[in-house]
């Protein structure tokens, strides 16, 4: 309303007042969070649980060593960031008993417990398994990220959470998740172009859109490929193909198969995108963009994921958040 220059003048005038000339030592107000002092003791005896293959796989993907000897970081894979009340209470108990009363939220919509004694890992895993949060594959392609979409955001165009649930089935195929180069990829989706689901920095990303079909509006997604936030960040390249929402999982499967079949030895997905070009992916996606006439056999295309009525775009003022 007043403009940046007038605002700057007001600040400079205020700083000439006597209160601004007084010396001030902020040391007494500084808060140092000494996590190590609250860390669980390494001398405590924990239960010894059978080392199953499932537990070993979880150890390899969800647990990292801390610099402090004897302590681990446990990454809890939270599907699409959703927790029910029982899970929330048990996670709080894990935090208090095994992690010094702390937990961190990651950009992958997961939880990270630091300062977990190595000897306590089996107990922690056993509790996580009892509340269905012991899945392996944290920060891998199976760790799909989605914003709330139309589930709760008024700016959402599509049900990105519904798509995320459907996507997990595709990327969890053994032939894909066991491929080292595919496993390290990331799939993210947003229910609108605002990008709260971080689709623009994913290896394969989507944002919600609307397609005009013969029978009316169809929920759809714009496709982005080749993004990355590992090391140097790069924004994904937008393809020219808009995919109906119900065809997106199949389209992702086709893109991954295309990459796996045509990559060079050790070639990561971003490098493959640079070499093959976006146009080659548009050819792969061409078979998934058709918008059929509306009839009893095609009605599913006109209904969004996790919905039961024909799609209609409805947007309003709202706040976006992962």
Language-model regions, residue ranges each:
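Peripheral terminal and linker regions in Fe-S/redox and tRNA-modifying enzymes
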Residues: 1-322
């Amino acid at each position: 309303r007043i403009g940046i220059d007038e605002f700057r003048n007001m600040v400079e005038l205020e700083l000439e007042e006597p209160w601004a000339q007084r010396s001030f030592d902020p040391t007494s107000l500084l808060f140092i969070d000494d996590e190590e002092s609250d860390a669980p003791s390494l001398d405590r005896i924990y239960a010894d649980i059978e080392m199953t293959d499932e537990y070993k796989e979880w150890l390899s993907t969800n647990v990292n060593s801390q610099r402090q000897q004897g302590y681990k970081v446990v990454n809890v894979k939270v599907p699409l960031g959703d927790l029910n009340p029982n899970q929330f209470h048990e996670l709080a108990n894990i935090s208090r008993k095994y992690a010094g009363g702390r937990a961190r939220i990651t950009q992958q919509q997961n939880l990270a417990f630091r300062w977990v004694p190595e000897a306590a890992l089996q107990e922690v895993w056993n509790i996580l398994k009892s509340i269905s949060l012991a899945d392996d594959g944290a920060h891998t392609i199976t760790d799909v990220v989605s914003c709330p979409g139309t589930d709760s955001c008024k700016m959402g165009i599509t049900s990105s959470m519904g798509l995320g649930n459907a996507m997990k089935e595709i990327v969890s195929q053994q032939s894909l998740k066991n491929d080292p180069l595919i496993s390290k990829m990331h799939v993210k989706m947003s229910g609108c172009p605002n990008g709260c689901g971080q689709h623009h920095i994913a290896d394969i990303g989507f944002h919600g859109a609307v397609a005009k079909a013969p029978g009316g509006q169809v929920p759809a997604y714009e496709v982005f490929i080749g993004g990355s936030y590992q090391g140097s960040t790069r924004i994904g390249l937008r393809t020219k193909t808009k995919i109906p929402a119900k065809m997106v999982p199949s389209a992702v499967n086709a893109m991954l198969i295309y990459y796996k079949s045509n990559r060079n030895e050790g070639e990561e997905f971003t490098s493959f995108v640079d070499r093959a070009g976006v146009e080659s992916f548009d050819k792969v996606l061409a078979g998934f963009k058709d918008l059929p006439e509306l009839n009893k056999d095609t009605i599913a295309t006109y209904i969004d994921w996790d919905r039961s009525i024909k799609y209609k775009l409805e947007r309003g003022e709202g706040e976006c958040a992962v």
